[in-house]
Amino acid sequence: MEPAVLAAHHLPHHEPISFGIDQILSGPEPPGGGLGPGQSGQSHGESAAFSSGFHGASGYAPAGSLASLPRGSGVGPGGVIRVPAHRPLPVPPPSGAAPAVPGPSGLGGAGGLAGLTFPWMDSGRRFAKDRLTAALSPFSGTRRIGHPYQNRTPPKRKKPRTSFSRSQVLELERRFLRQKYLASAERAALAKALRMTDAQVKTWFQNRRTKWRRQTAEEREAERHRAGRLLLHLQQDALPRPLRPPLPPDPLCLHNSSLFALQNLQPWAEDNKVASVSGLASVV
């Protein structure tokens, strides 16, 4: 059966009202939005009857009634309940208790009003939680995925470079010139003599051999370049130089001994000079 029908059966009998619609329309408007005490009482009585009838039919009684509400719980004069702008969210029942069936007005007793939550309360809590998370995010250990500076592994801290005294370096260099590789016993004896550890002597000799190999390779490369340049210079010197072809003998010089001797003394003379000499000989 419908709840409205059940509520209609359980409506109590009220006294007839002392005024009608004509009196309301003709008379002045009473304060409180046009609702008189009789109308407020009637609506309150109908809602109470509806709530009691509904709960009676369902077999469940609410935790409290309107009569048990305190004065500061939003109940106005005449039993009118002040409903907030936002409809409250239903409070989940405790574990082990029977599920509460909300009434038509959506309000319970004083205990229900104390545990009501509104949407603006949840938004405020979420806002405070977000602000707290944002404030603690720089100090949290979690790293953002995809950030290049936070995903890369931190660089390893380099060990401080060991510095040796001048006397130790001179003795090590002198020993290296004589012997490039040391046996374990020789290395231990040298480390003890120089007041160094075996690992320090071993590392120094390894680094010195690497440097020696690099210097030897560079020196060999320089010698190879010098030898190539020297060979190229020798080849250029060994090549025969092109000789100037001899000048054809002048027929006048063949018959004149002085001109012939002059031509032989100047083999570098050009053709024009030879021609000039020939002209002079003809003049003589």
UniProtKB/Swiss-Prot annotation:
Spans of biased composition, class Pro residues?
87-96
Gene3D superfamilies recorded: Homeodomain-like
The record ties this protein, via PROSITE patterns, to: HOMEOBOX_1 (PS00027), HOMEOBOX_2 (PS50071)
The biological process GO terms on file are: enteric nervous system development; mesoderm formation; negative regulation of dendrite morphogenesis; regulation of transcription by RNA polymerase II
Quick one: where's region Disordered? Answer: 20-52, 78-104, 140-166
Q: Where is the composition biased (Low complexity)?
A: 40-52
Q: Does the keyword DNA-binding apply?
A: yes
Its domain of life reads Eukaryota
Q: Identify one Gene Ontology CC term for this UniProt entry.
A: nucleus
**Gene Ontology molecular-function annotations:** DNA binding; DNA-binding transcription activator activity, RNA polymerase II-specific; DNA-binding transcription factor activity; sequence-specific double-stranded DNA binding
Q: After gene disruption, what is the outcome? A: Mice are born at the expected Mendelian ratio and show no visible phenotype at birth. After weaning, about 43% of the mice exhibit distended abdomens and growth retardation, the others remain symptomless. About 36% of the mice die between 3 and 6 weeks after birth. Affected mice display distended proximal colons and cecums. Both affected and asymptotic mice have increased numbers of myenteric neurons in ganglia in the proximal and distal colon with a concomitant increase in myenteric ganglion size.
UniProt keyword annotations, A-Z? Activator, Developmental protein, DNA-binding, Homeobox, Nucleus, Transcription, Transcription regulation
According to its UniProt record, where is this protein mainly located?
A: nucleus
Q: What SMART domains does this protein's entry cite?
A: HOX
**Does the record carry Nucleus as a key word?**
yes
Q: Residues annotated as DNA-binding region?
A: 157-216
Localization recorded for this chain is: Nucleus
Q: What does this protein do?
A: Transcription activator that binds DNA elements with the consensus sequence 5'-CGGTAATTGG-3'. Binds DNA via its homeobox. Required for normal cell death of enteric neurons in the gastrointestinal tract. Required for normal development of the enteric nervous system, and for proper development of normal motility of the gastrointestinal tract.
Report the protein name in the record.
Answer: T-cell leukemia homeobox protein 2
Q: Which organism is it from?
A: Mus musculus (Mouse)
Q: Which gene is this protein's source?
A: Tlx2
